[in-house]
Amino acid sequence: GIEQSKSLNEKYGNIFNFVYRKRIWNSNEECYMGWERKRGLLNQLNEYLLGNITNPFRANTIDISQMNKVKYIITLDSDTDLTLKSGLELVGAMAHILNKPEVNERGDLVISGHALMQPRVGVGLVESRKSIFTQVYAGEGGTDSYTNVISNLYQDNFDEGIFTGKGIYDLSIFSKVLANEIKENTVLSHDLLEGSYLRCALTSDIMLMDGYPSSYISFRTRLYRWIRGDYQILPWLGKTIENKKGETKQNPLKLLSKYKIFSNIV
């Protein structure tokens, strides 16, 4: 990874960095893994870029002195592709004055604007044709230039959508609201929670291309992981939750967010 980033920097300028996390023993999973999976990676990266923690990475090419102007982070999965200009469009949408996020007095919930945006996600043309299973279940792959904006119940009626793990977020607001909000080893599917805390918006006119499970077995494995994660966030339907420190606090999520959690289960 370090060599690849060096090669890219030689070709395009010094704009690429590579980080690799240490694996630590997780007694719940009985294996060595990155702390708190993707959620932990984002939290560690956020706190490191903001100067709140020292370098937590095993390999790291970031010059932290050059990172003080970072405002937004685009997060993707390994099988997600940014389409042409989609990154710039996401930044433009986040920077719009009407989308500026405002946090409540306790500092644990975005109450207006948006600190997170979720683009529309489609299945790549190649991904949709890589096996008989994907040809049957993945639907039409690629983009449709005649259908740029789609309707969404939550976005159209409540000015917020559902986060599915690919999008852009405000670095400082994400850290302020979520750094100490979720207890370790309790949540597998964190996307819906993060979207609820940060008041995620759906930008349906901006599209990313995603992969699709190539077989029924991989599809069921992913579905099992999703369902397991959905049940793990049921405590957020109550009036109180436990934060990262194990302290009981008032659940800041509003009724709409709780309905999203409930509807995901049923």
Positions of predicted regions on the chain:
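Internal catalytic domains of large membrane-associated glycosyltransferases
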Residues: 1-254, 258
